[in-house]
């Protein structure tokens, strides 16, 4: 299990299992937010709590803490064809030692292809210095 919270602790998330990877995306939103995402489906091993404010650019809702402004998670606005709603939590809100060895998957989101690049051996600890 791994968990994280915003700076003030009002918004929290929990993953029942250690994520297999963290995603670093270079799209205009993720790059500016400086996030590392762990993906799953709402109610299926990932839970979130606390009041948030959201920004809804298209099909996703980016959720921030009302008090401190930390980006906590995003989720799809509507469930997919199988009735499941995709969600991603910001692993940068976890304690560093809890997520240090999770490998990074790099994604090209800037051109909207969301193509995965080959792994280069880096993990979260390499992104935090």
Residue ranges of model-derived segments:
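A short Gly-Trp-Pro
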Residues: 1-5, 10-129
